[in-house]
Amino acid sequence: MKRLIALLLVVLIAVSLYGCAGEKSKGPEPGTPLNTFYQAIMDAQPENAEELILFEESNPDLIASFYPGLDSIELSQQAFYMPPIATHPCEIVLVEVKNDADVQKVADIFQARIDMGADNTNYPESAAGWQLYAQVQKSGNFVCMIVLPEGYVIPENVFEV
């Protein structure tokens, strides 16, 4: 009888612990507005930091010049935030791809943009910013390329709002 009670207690504890494990995050829901992530990035900045000035860019020729190959990938949504001065290392690009097989392709395109900025020998200070403060993040069908100036915060997971 004691063994049966002990066994039942072990099973009960195991079931309780399994219930406490929680559900792993699968990433953002498809169709989550990209502005949600952009605003979360802006809200994460230190209070004493100067306000970041970025403009939403929609010119397809300009976008294609910075992100060659991106125009051949089917996107559900896209948002490009660029600084007023093109050589300033401060960009936030957020996309949601329609086909999950394209996530890595987009990440590679974004990494190529980072590499291009980091290799800019005409503006060594700008290149240093791209080398030190730029990254690509992925979650589900969402991909982000972000570079912010020194002293600003890139969230560990841009897509965790």
Can you describe what each PLM-predicted range is?
Residues 1-8:
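Positively charged n-region of N-terminal signal peptides that target proteins for export
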Residues 11-12:
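Repetitive helical segments and hydrophobic/amphipathic motifs
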Residues 15-19:
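C-terminal motif of bacterial Sec signal peptides marking the signal peptidase cleavage site
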Residues 20-91, 97-161:
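Soluble, non-membrane globular domain cores that form compact, hydrophobic packing
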